[in-house]
């Protein structure tokens, strides 16, 4: 995110699915790059400003499944807004449930995995020399999920 070539707004929007699940170490990276973070809580806040935002929006995780919209009806509006956001090619990152929501919005199947993945491993960042998130390369991150998804077409 070189300031001479970056035209993104200097605020990152993040959609939470639990109030205590935030950006963690990633927030420090954005802070070091001069970005502020504004959080929106799914099911509580109006997500339209985050989903319509021209800058980077990060969709975070949570202990729910994409396929649980009957129990979590806010997912339907979030998915609808996410489909439009992706159609408009707005910068979007999905972490955990967020990645599942993006896959679903792009037409991929999201489903319960054969077994849960729980544990720590090192994050591997691709194209480290040109990646604004390269500061995270090699850090230990927690994996804790039971759902998985097929890659969307052309991903």
Q: What is each stretch, according to the model?
A:
Residues 7-13:
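Extreme N-terminal starter segment of soluble prokaryotic enzymes
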Residues 15-17, 42, 97:
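Cofactor-binding loop segments of dinucleotide-utilizing enzymes, especially the Rossmann-like FAD-
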Residues 15-18, 59-63, 146:
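Glycine-rich His-Gly loop
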Residues 20-25:
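Short N-terminal binding/cap micro-motifs at the start of the first secondary-structure element
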Residues 28-93:
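Flexible gly/pro-rich beta->alpha loop and the following alpha-helix that scaffold active-site loops
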Residues 85-109:
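Catalytic nucleophile loop
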Residues 106-155:
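Pocket-forming structural segment of enzyme catalytic cores
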């Amino acid at each position: 995110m070189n300031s001479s070539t970056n035209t993104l707004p200097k605020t990152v929007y993040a959609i939470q699915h639990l109030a205590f699940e935030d950006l963690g170490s990633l927030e420090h990276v954005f802070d070091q790059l001069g970005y502020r973070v504004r959080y929106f809580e799914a099911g509580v806040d109006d997500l339209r400003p985050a989903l319509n935002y021209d800058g980077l929006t990060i969709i975070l995780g949570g202990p729910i499944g994409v396929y649980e919209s009957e129990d979590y009806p806010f997912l339907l509006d979030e998915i609808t807004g996410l489909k439009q956001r992706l159609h408009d090619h707005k910068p979007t990152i999905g972490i955990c449930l967020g990645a599942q929501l993006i896959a679903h919005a792009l037409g991929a199947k999201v489903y319960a995995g054969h077994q849960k993945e729980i544990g720590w491993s090192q994050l591997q960042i691709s194209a480290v020399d040109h990646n604004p998130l390269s500061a995270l390369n090699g850090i230990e991150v927690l994996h804790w999920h039971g759902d998985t998804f097929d890659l969307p077409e052309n991903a």
